[in-house]
Regions:
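Short, surface-exposed interaction patches in beta-rich subdomains
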Residues: 2, 40-41, 56-67, 74-88, ...
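Right-handed parallel beta-helix
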Residues: 2-69
């Protein structure tokens, strides 16, 4: 149990797993060189994870802001909230039922699978597939990949989407109430939100 007068924890773990449950903090900093980190049922204003080799698993937790930098490891977030900033060198990212105002993800090598509610999203990957399921209002969404397929679905009915691939196919769901502009540009509703999806080598599917 954390004493009530402790609001900030900084943890240095050269080797070994970290398991944290049922705490409330203003700030949590975790620097782990080797080992997995598991976080569950916590409330934090800010959490920062820097990991060299290991997986990060966060569930049923609320943050104002969560940031992470992993050299090699997978990221799993389930039923969480908070503005999210992630930089992953090698590893898969799986985010389910996450709500935020801003999400920024970058992965050099790995797949990204997300079901989120956030009006502002930026996702970049060098090599890997991207699968996005976005709920709620859209303000600005930018998804780019050097090599990989991109699948996106949204329940929003007010956006304009620009889809581009140099080597691949583009499939825009014909059941959506859209107007098509020149090229692979589409407007749904009044076109309030902006969506840009671009891959150099890969297919794009939008529904």
């Amino acid at each position: 149990k954390i004493p009530s007068n402790v609001s900030t924890i900084t943890m240095e773990a050269p080797a070994g797993d970290v398991d944290i449950n049922d705490i409330k903090l203003d700030e949590f900093n975790c620097h782990n060189k080797s080992g997995d980190v598991s976080i569950s049922r916590v409330e934090m204003k800010r959490a920062d994870f820097t990991m060299l080799a290991g997986d990060l698993d966060v569930s049923d937790s609320n943050f104002d802001e969560i940031s992470m930098k992993l050299s090699a490891g997978d990221v799993d977030l389930t039923n969480t909230t908070g503005n999210l900033y992630a930089n992953i060198a090698a590893g898969d990212i799986d985010i389910q039922k996450h709500a935020a105002n801003v999400i920024q993800l970058s992965a050099a090598a790995g797949d990204i699978d997300m079901e989120v509610s956030s009006p502002i999203i930026e996702v970049k990957t060098t090599a890997g597939d991207i699968d996005l399921d976005i709920h709620g209002e859209i303000q600005n969404i930018k998804v780019t990949s050097t090599a990989g397929d991109i699948d996106m679905a949204t329940d929003s009915k007010d956006y304009q989407a620009s889809l581009s691939t140099n080597f691949g196919d583009v499939d825009f769901d014909d059941d959506l109430p859209y107007q098509k502009l020149h090229g692979k540009k589409y407007i749904v509703g009044n076109g309030k939100g902006e969506i840009l999806i671009k891959t150099n080598a890969g297919d794009i599917s939008f529904q």
